[in-house]
Amino acid sequence: MWDLNDSPAAEAAPPPLSPSADDSGASSSSAAAVVEIPDDADDDSAAVVVVTRQFFPPAVPGGGGDPAPGNARAGWLRLAGAAPPVAATGPAASAAVSKKSRRGPRSRSSQYRGVTFYRRTGRWESHIWDCGKQVYLGGFDTAHAAARAYDRAAIKFRGVEADINFSLEDYEDDLKQMSNLTKEEFVHVLRRQSTGFPRGSSKYRGVTLHKCGRWEARMGQFLGKKYVYLGLFDTEEEAARAYDRAAIKCNGKDAVTNFDPSIYAGEFEPPAAATGDAAEHNLDLSLGSSAGSKRGNVDGGGDDEITGGGGGGTGSDQRVPMAFDLDWQTAAARSTKAKFDQNSNHPQMPPVLQVTHLPFSPRHHHQFLSNGDPGTAGGLSLTIGAGMAGHWPPQQQQGWGNAGGMSWPLPPHPPPPPTNAAAAATATAAAASSRFPPYIATQASTWLQKNGFHSLTRPT
């Protein structure tokens, strides 16, 4: 039998490298790993060195010492056997730690926070996030100017504790301006200070280059309109001043302007004009002269008409119909008018006189009476008020009834006249206060004869 201990394989086997390696080889494969590493020292030799590394070192009983040297513990998980890198030290490492941001990474295209370079426009634009929205702060020629705009907006939006690109001491002067403006107004200030305006825009607020080549001033969102046109100007400064004046007039001294509002203080003072008493006095004089002239015309015209009417009433042909315009409700302002139509001579006119509302008084009652008889006035009777009878000559009744084949109705006949003038005045006053026209009804031609009334004829 072969002796296994004296076998050639056993004699050719190399001796173990160390006791620990022999023990680890006897253990399970999960506790050890075998890596073939070429020998760098001898390039010509093709010898293979087997290196066994232990993942979990055995605990040393009865002591807390290190079971393995420090370099062995450091290389537990480094299967390739490379040495650990040396930590970087120096001012560069400390600067990198101090610049670490708690609000996220900076812009990829700029070293400053909140600044981005746009290839299409060729300028540096600044943005800031507020309430989940990105707010545009303007376009600038340099990244440094855009970074300063971002810093000012960040201080306004987030306070002095905000993360900014430069030190807070550089913005001491801007802190005073921020306190007087809202967020929206301060953003407009930053945009006006930017230099990256599109074509046709101006750095002044409310100013735009018109297509005719002049500068247009306008104010937007006023009184429900989209914008209010203020005019065209030759220069930007003139248009900006026009906008400032309009803004101060509409919004007062707190309006946002392009220039210092103090330069417009003298333009909005009230002009040296007449006092209020003098203005009221002039107004009274103008109104008084107008009213006096009208009153004089009314009074003078009334007197002339009365004078002419009196003569015409006595000498005119009584067969001609008369049109009376009597309005004694305004007797305090003007006299009674009696207008006689001398040019009209129409014997076939209807007998209904154009007297629809005749308030009467005893004084005026006697002007239309002849010998005190209320029924006749020179052979011609009139319907006056509601208390006097009306009669016309039969010749006129016959002519009116057959005028052109047309039948004209006779005027109504009121109740019998009162016994005295006082009763007649009372009845007419009641009709005058009601302001209703007298009652007019159409009756047959024989109504007067059936009721016992006869027309009075003019004596020949």
Swiss-Prot record:
Motif stretch (Nuclear localization signal): 99-108
GO molecular function terms attached to this record: DNA-binding transcription factor activity; transcription cis-regulatory region binding
Deleted gene: phenotype: Several spikelet and inflorescence developmental defects, including altered florets palea and lemma structures, abnormal numbers, size, appearance, and identities of floral organs, reduced primary branches number, and longer and fewer grains associated with a loss of grain shattering. Crook-neck-like rachilla between the sterile lemmas and the rudimentary glumes in place of the spikelet abscission zone (AZ).
Motif annotated as EAR, chain positions: 283-287
Feature: DNA-binding region: 111-167, 203-260
Chief place of localization: nucleus
Family: Belongs to the AP2/ERF transcription factor family. AP2 subfamily.
Subunit comment: May form homodimer.
Function: Transcription factor. Involved in spikelet transition and development. Prevents lemma and palea elongation as well as grain growth. Required for seed shattering through specifying abscission zone (AZ) development.
Name this protein carries in UniProt: APETALA2-like protein 5
